[in-house]
Amino acid sequence: MNKPKIFIDGEAGTTGLQIRERLAGRSDLELLSIDPVRRKDSAARAELLNAADVSILCLHDDAAREAVSLTTNPASRLLDASTAHRIHPDWVFGFPELSAEQPEKIRQARYVANPGCYSTGAIALLAPLTGRGLLPADFPVHIQGYSGYTGGGRALVDAHEQGSAHPSKGAFISYGLTLEHKHLPETMVYGGLTRKPVFTPNVGGWAQGMTVTVPLHLAELGVSAEALHAALKEHYAGQQYVKVFELADNPEILDPQTLNGTNNLELFVYPAADGERALLAARLDNLGKGASGAAVQNLELMLGLS
């Protein structure tokens, strides 16, 4: 039996490298590679995109769109890690835990869009609540994200790992202060929101690992923290990669690096003693469940390996 052929278009980048590392030791897949000197050669890329059973696009948005146009073989499937297609109607959103039907949608899809890292945490917290009517779609939501510097873009990665100059090197910074972060559209669509949330991303001096938090005033919702927690527990029951902590087991400190190197996602509900407030929190590796780990999970679904 022929092994499925996998091509990582953009394997030299952070996400591409990590996906390749996760797949390199597998005997059930054949990895196709492009000559490094031709990695921006459209003809060379097209040859591999059309030879592969699944190509994983680890590219900026415009290059990802180009890869789609280059893939003319109807039997070749695409898994896009960029933001280009996450809310496109022809693409299936690659968060298998979104619903009971989502894994099968991914299995059957020709085009799958891998979620963003911040949005993975936010959607994981919000979707079960909006879907059950506990959080109105037009509720004013505030989301805070705290990531290692790999979540802040190429300039920050280069500053920390290659010694290039950057004014925020080594510091804790808030960015995306226009409040129009690129993960907002998918967070709204798949988080079940009709009103734009206020989302503030932040990065620190560690390499990877993140937390995403959503503070809520419960009196405005008319629900308890226990009800929110029960909804999350019900939604993610039996999931391999998502764990909802019991209220009594919540850690006093959330270290964003705890899940580094894994495809795991942990969810927490922190109730205030007065019963009037709660903090929803998600913890994940921004390069794991937020990128390469999720890509491998989606790839396995697309190939019928899980």
From Swiss-Prot:
Provide the E.C. number(s) assigned to this enzyme: 1.2.1.38
Kindly list any coiled-coil regions of this protein: none
What's in the GO CC field?
cytoplasm
According to the UniProt entry, where is the signal peptide? Answer: none
- Catalytic class of the enzyme: oxidoreductase
Question: Which domain of life does the UniProt lineage start with?
Answer: Bacteria
Q: Which SMART domains did the record assign?
A: Semialdhyde_dh
Read off the Pfam families from this record: Semialdhyde_dhC_1
Which GO terms of type biological process are on file?
A: L-arginine biosynthetic process
Compartments annotated for it: namely: Cytoplasm
Query: Which reaction is recorded as catalysed by this protein?
Result: N-acetyl-L-glutamate 5-semialdehyde + phosphate + NADP(+) = N-acetyl-L-glutamyl 5-phosphate + NADPH + H(+)
Sorted alphabetically, which PROSITE patterns does this protein's record hold? ARGC
Active site per UniProt? 117
Into which family does the record put it? Belongs to the NAGSA dehydrogenase family. Type 2 subfamily.
User: What does this chain do?
Assistant: Catalyzes the NADPH-dependent reduction of N-acetyl-5-glutamyl phosphate to yield N-acetyl-L-glutamate 5-semialdehyde.
Protein name listed in UniProt: N-acetyl-gamma-glutamyl-phosphate reductase
Which organism was this protein described from? Deinococcus radiodurans (strain ATCC 13939 / DSM 20539 / JCM 16871 / CCUG 27074 / LMG 4051 / NBRC 15346 / NCIMB 9279 / VKM B-1422 / R1)
